[in-house]
Swiss-Prot record:
Residues 67-95, 120-136 have a biased composition (Basic and acidic residues). A lipid is attached at residue 27 (N-palmitoyl cysteine). InterPro entries: SNase_OB-fold_sf, Staphylococal_nuclease_OB-fold. It comes from Mycoplasma pneumoniae (strain ATCC 29342 / M129 / Subtype 1) (Mycoplasmoides pneumoniae). This is Uncharacterized lipoprotein MG186 homolog. Disulfide bonds: none annotated.
Amino acid sequence: MKGFSCSRPGYLTGLLLLAVAPILTACTRDYTTKNEFQLTTAQQAKLKPATIEYWRDGDTPEINYASEERRKEAEQKSKENAKKEDKKEEKKTEDSQDSSSASTQVRSSKHGLRIYGIDTPEKHVSSKGDSTGDEKIEAEKASNYAEKLIPKGSTVWVWSLNTYSYDREVGALFFKSNPKQTFFQSFEVAMVEAGHAIPIAGTGLNLIADPELSADDPLSVIGLQLANAANKAYNAKINIWSHDTDGYRSLTAVYKLRGADISWTRFLDEANGYSSASAGTGASLYQLWDQRQAKLAQKGS
């Protein structure tokens, strides 16, 4: 299995600079995972705050938008009531009634969230039954990691794709390890970096090269770091990657019920054995990202 080596054979001193340039670019790329996202005002406007009720499995939490709204309402009402302590008793009663009325107007919105862009091993598939062996072990490890990373009752932010998969809303999940931090963290990046999930692209990855088309797709924000995380876990051979020295065989050992989506190869560097180049699945995310940056630079010039 190949890693991030820049010592590829056949590059002689006399090679033309034009031929060597892409290799030099690849060798100087920073593959360090940076799970810190300073979202723009427009991007933050896409986020919906919610509360984690519990985790169904490693890529599907049960969330509640309404409970988060109620929490904010309660905090605001508490502040308002604190300022009205010197008001008449009947006024306080009115406030209490108003608060009760406002709470009942908030519609319950508890449902499953299918995390966009990743897939963890399955615990159970209705048409195929429960997982066993390594698949079951990795599925449970993924769920446990998710529960520790974002415990029940935590506030999260959902970037919804406004689509549903069965009974689950589809969206990217952001969180903050510290409420005071100014940046957001991606749940998807964290799971992939820890080797508990593979990144899956679908058609969304093809939009990355066009900044205007991909503005509504969370991959336009987290895609590069998702690729860095995938390469880190892949080369470290941790968790889902640890079951065989061959990356593909390792994945097929832990994705038996669902099957391993070949789109994960598009997140790997071309130096890796199962990159999109060797798998014939199309341009890698790194190539698409370079195209994206070139278009942004051209637009800004």
